[in-house]
Amino acid sequence: MIELFDVDYNLLPDNRSKELFSLRKKTFKDRLDWLVNCENNMEFDEYDNRHATYIFGTYQNHVICSLRFIETKYPNMISDGVFDTYFNDIKLPDGNYVEASRLFIDKARIQALQLHQAPISAMLFLSMINYARNCGYEGIYAIISHPMRIIFQRSGWHISVVKTGCSEKNKNIYLIYMPIDDANRNRLLARINQHATKMG
């Protein structure tokens, strides 16, 4: 059974943090070749701190997907200008929002655990909406790649592109807003239930 849960940075066990940061290195450095900082075969940065909360998706106690949330009132990758060279002036609005970053689904583990038929992206996206709603946020902002945008669109989550930029690889990247309303939540639930019916 796939389980999804959130953990604050301060409560993250050592073994789980090592697993997370190792998987992030595999995804963002080894597979995607992003400009990220790596040390001891792990990827982490200054935003992995007490203001961060992580969503984990696990199967048989193995992490298969994850992302990091940071309230936009605290330093985060978008507001701090990490992506300024890729965009022409981006700024998050004032309000009670949360930024999502370092989102990944581990393809190798999905294959090894024979989960390729499971609606993992929809489950992860639903957990994002549920977390944001439970915490009283107005919505979620993130910067994503073009392939990730396609995954969002296929899931049924009606995200909106706030601004388009160009990465160091000359690929389109997007500042997106993710609404957390009932309609989007229900579409994701329907997609998950549709898969469950097929599997059943």
From Swiss-Prot:
It is an enzyme of class 2 (transferase). GO terms for molecular function: N-acyl homoserine lactone synthase activity. The keyword RNA-binding does not apply. It catalyses: a fatty acyl-[ACP] + S-adenosyl-L-methionine = an N-acyl-L-homoserine lactone + S-methyl-5'-thioadenosine + holo-[ACP] + H(+). Keywords: Autoinducer synthesis, Quorum sensing, S-adenosyl-L-methionine, Transferase. GO terms for biological process: quorum sensing; signal transduction. The keyword S-adenosyl-L-methionine applies. Its EC number is 2.3.1.184. Belongs to the autoinducer synthase family. Required for the synthesis of BHL (N-butanoyl-L-homoserine lactone). This is Acyl-homoserine-lactone synthase. It comes from Serratia liquefaciens. The lineage of its organism: Bacteria, Pseudomonadati, Pseudomonadota, Gammaproteobacteria, Enterobacterales.
